[in-house]
Amino acid sequence: MKYLDEYRDPVLAAAFVRRIDSLSTRPWVLMEICGGQTHTIMRYGIDDLVKGKVELVHGPGCPVCVTPVEMIDKALEIAARPDVIFVSYGDMLRVPGSKTDLFEVKAKGGDVRIVYSPMDAVKIARDNPSRQVVFFGVGFETTAPANAMALWQARLERLPNFSMLASHVLVPPAIRLILGSPVNRVQGFIAPGHVCTIMGCSEYEALVNDFHVPIVVGGFEPTDLLESIAMLTAQLEEGRAELENQYARSVTRSGNIAAQNLLGIVFEVADRKWRGIGKIPLSGLRLREEFAPWDAEKIFGLEEAEVEEPAECISALVLQGLKKPLDCPAFATRCSPDHPLGASMVSSEGACAAYHQYKRHGELVNVQ
């Protein structure tokens, strides 16, 4: 299949592995940011192909995983109301809050519905004028423009019964936090291609310059990731720190200007708490005051309450590249996709879920 098979070409993949092997004179620690990249690495055993030359650790690029417990609890509170239709993407239903999850709220009679587009939520509001329809808007810069468009459309139609519980986060501030940590191990980053398709790659230049760290914008197929690893290895071996774009078939320096403009109209940058990590300055998006009539937090008067993560869940350390899922004593025993302790196990993009699906015994699980 064109635009797919060539990025899974075993001959090309083997060539990249040989290049990494020939370049590396010492083991380097690299972090892929996006959860989709993590799943590709696990599915195809890319970490094993470069073992001894490169150690791959996994970053906080799973939006479901970093949505704080407090925000999940707000969603649960709204979803349990009899006058509300609560609308969400499917992967949020099993994410644990402090006491329960949306799936259980639905099982107990809450009107919780799964959609594949935020515009579906707008249609539900249009079709149910007597009910409050709340869309759970979660995601990075990739999904934020579509959510912004839903809010724009709701304002255009003057839909009084539509609102959004928004929990959007931004990638560069999270990378800055990791690099600024005194226990940071990461020496190079594979930046998320889908995020950069929207935002462009220029905003990563400041990180390269401030921390003298190489960053390569990478794609999501096996040869994309192997080429990105080779590019980072070459930079590190040569003592360079540059921003490079491996995913040039999708990413430009400036990104999608129209999408960025829409984000600027609907949202403003704000501090945001990340699950297990804490508050990161200027790392999120909140609705501008002009969109307050569609802001679920304001409409329902939700209060912030501090909630602690389960003590045995180490997903916060996994998301910062300090631990791996197999280091967790609860992995695949007390924590599984059916009974997750943390969001990294239940999300379709979570690192713990990737290890459980492909590598739960420490060896690659055969996948057809």
Region spans (language model):
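Metallocofactor- and cofactor-centric catalytic cores in central/energy metabolism, strongly enriched
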Residues: 1-130, 144, 148, 154-157, ...
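Short, surface-exposed amphipathic charged segments that create phosphate/polyanion-binding patches used
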Residues: 71-74, 126-133, 177-182, 204-206, ...
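Glycine-rich, charge-decorated loop segments at or immediately adjacent to ligand/cofactor-binding or catalytic sites
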Residues: 97, 171-182, 225-228
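A conserved active-site cap/scaffold subdomain adjacent to cofactor or substrate pockets
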Residues: 165, 183-251
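Short, conserved secondary-structure transition motifs
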Residues: 168-175, 255-258
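Internal helical hairpin/lid segments
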Residues: 226-317
